[in-house]
Amino acid sequence: MTFTKKANQVFNQAIDDYHVFDNINTPIKNPFEEGSIENRLYLKCWIDTVQWHFEDIIRDPQIDPVEALALKRRIDKSNQDRTDLVEQIDSYFREVYKDVKVLPDARINTESPAWAVDRLSILALKIYHMKEQVMRPEASEEHKTKCQNKLNVLLEQQIDLSTAIDQLLEDIEAGRKYMKVYKQMKMYNDPSTNPILYNQQK
C-alpha cells in the first residue's frame, strides 16, 4: 500500500468519526497506536476537521462578538497545533529516510513531504463537504450540478496530489531528492515577537 493510500484512508476515517456527532467540542478518540504515523495522520485530520467547522461558525453574521473572540482564540491555537503536527510528521519522514545516501545531483523540493500531506488532509475535507452539497435534498439541480463539477475537479486533484507525494517519497528514498525542513516560526503567537504582546510587558 502506498503512503497516500494509507493516509487517505486514515483521513476519511477521522472525518467520518467526527461527523458521528458533528460537534466541535467532541473529544477525540484516536483509534491508532500512540507514536504510529497513523496516529499522527488521524490527529492531523481531526484538527483540520474541527477547524473547518470553527471557520463555518465564525462566519455566522449573527454570532455574538464575545463568542466570536473566544472562537478566534481557538482557531489560533488550532493553527499552532496543526503546524506542530506537520513538523512531527516531517520528523517521521526524516527518521524513515535518515540512512539514505543522497546522490550528488539530488534536488530539493519546494515543500517538505508533511506540508504536502497537510494539503491532502484538507483536500479530503473539501471532498467530503462537496459531496454533502451534491446530496443536499433541498438544493436546486443547478446547485447540485455546479457542486458535482467542483467535486470532479477535487477528486482529480486528490489523485494528482497523492501521486505527486508518493513520487516525492520514492525520490527521497532513492536519494534523487533530499528533505530540508524549516520550522514555521510563527510570530503572532510568540509573546517575544508579537508587538501587541511584548509592548504590554513594558
Residue ranges of predicted features:
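Anionic, Ser/Thr-rich low-complexity intrinsically disordered regions
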Residues: M1-K202
